[in-house]
Regions:
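Non-heme di-metal
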Residues: 1-132
Length: 132
């Protein structure tokens, strides 16, 4: 299996890069914040794993803060409004599952959908992460 090459961006200061990064940064910041809230709700639903889930929630919250800092380092403001609008249906679905006691639904949304998105989005940070 052939491995893909790392993303190559020659101009981190170009308008196109900054606009795209603003959107991705907003999605990652909001996504990490949602993960924090989701793990805290899961901690209520799974008391035997509460400590671990609260630890994961705190970690996600720190990630959100770190990604805000990464954007600030590049003088880019995250497009949080777009991210909130895009994540709203997924977050509402998580809340609906939580209210209905559908633990499996909550775990699928957080453990698969939100976390897989995060892993995919992190690839966009690789070219700038070392300098940050």
């Amino acid at each position: 299996m052939q491995r893909s090459n790392p993303i190559k961006i020659s101009d981190f200061n170009s308008d196109a890069y900054r606009e795209a990064y603003s959107r991705i940064n907003g999605l990652v910041v909001v996504g990490e914040g949602l993960a924090d809230r989701h793990f805290r709700l899961l901690a209520r639903s799974i008391p035997e794993d509460r400590d671990e889930l609260e630890r994961l929630a705190a970690m996600e919250g720190r990630h959100a803060t770190d990604f805000v800092g990464c954007g600030r380092h590049l003088d880019i403001k995250p497009d949080v409004a777009l991210a909130r609008r895009l994540f709203a249906p997924l977050h509402q679905l998580f809340l609906d599952c939580d209210r209905a006691g559908d633990l499996t639904g909550c775990l699928v949304i957080q453990g698969l959908i939100v976390e897989c998105f995060a892993v995919a989005a992190y690839r966009c940070y690789l070219p700038v992460a070392d300098s940050y």
